[in-house]
Amino acid sequence: MPNSRIVSVPQRGEFFVRYAKNENANAPVVALLHGWTGNADINFFPVYAELVQHYSVLAVDHRGHGRGLRTNDRFALEDCADDVVAIMDQLGISSVTAVGYSMGGPIAMLMSKRHTNRVHSLVLCATALEWSATRGERTRWKIGRVVSPVFRLLTTPRLIDRYIKGKIPRASSAATLRPWLVSEIRRNDSWTMNQAGRALSKYDARPWAATLGVPTASIVTSRDSLVAPNKQHALAQATQATVIEIDGDHLVNWQKPELFTAAVVDAIRQVRE
């Protein structure tokens, strides 16, 4: 994995990041933005080795996730977007291709919206314009807000391991990583996870997604049970994105890591051309 470091940002705090600077000083920078309840490593471990050969790579653990910033403030996607740009300032990075996975998609899009000149292009993976357009979705979020805090308190390492075991086929190269994945998931702050879910439930980029105006690619997971493929296609249409469709569920990065890596590499290449 790329080397890790703590980046201190005035008025914000200390952030755990991975940053690998390419030997080519002119190599573009790719910022990897992870999903809800994940962290940079468990979302992007399959792609690190390939990306560092061609790009400088920045990976950030968002607030309350993994080794991310702990704060008493209510979780906001906008704060996460601003965090990444503030980290870029400290590292002397002028612009990035923002690769957003699931929740990382909204964070990447908000970076582009709020910091126009800092995002060269977007790669949006297994994500959507919104998650609450239907009554059923809104009901599920409401139930989740009530149940989630209790569920997280009762979740044991054994239950997490059982969940991961059920999601990763034995044939996957990631199957042997189960103990590590469990330990990484346990780093998350349960209060922040609940807050982040609430923030996602309120996110709606439909009024402004078409105005971003940057090269965009959308990696659509065609068997996704968490973010419906039709929602992913709606995002791609709104952002005029090049679509790369792959045969996988929401955790395709664990289930088919080689397929996921190939799609990410292809998507970045297309938006950088």
Language-model-derived ranges and their functions:
Residues 48, 215-248, 254:
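Conserved loop-alpha-helix segment in the C-terminal half of the alpha/beta-hydrolase fold
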Residues 1-14:
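N-terminal cap/lid segment of alpha/beta-hydrolase-fold proteins
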Residues 240-273:
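Catalytic active-site module of serine/aspartate enzymes centered on a nucleophile-bearing elbow/loop
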Residues 113, 121-151:
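Flexible "cap/lid" loop of the alpha/beta hydrolase fold
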Residues 45, 49, 58-99:
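Active-site loop/oxyanion-hole signature of alpha/beta-hydrolase fold enzymes
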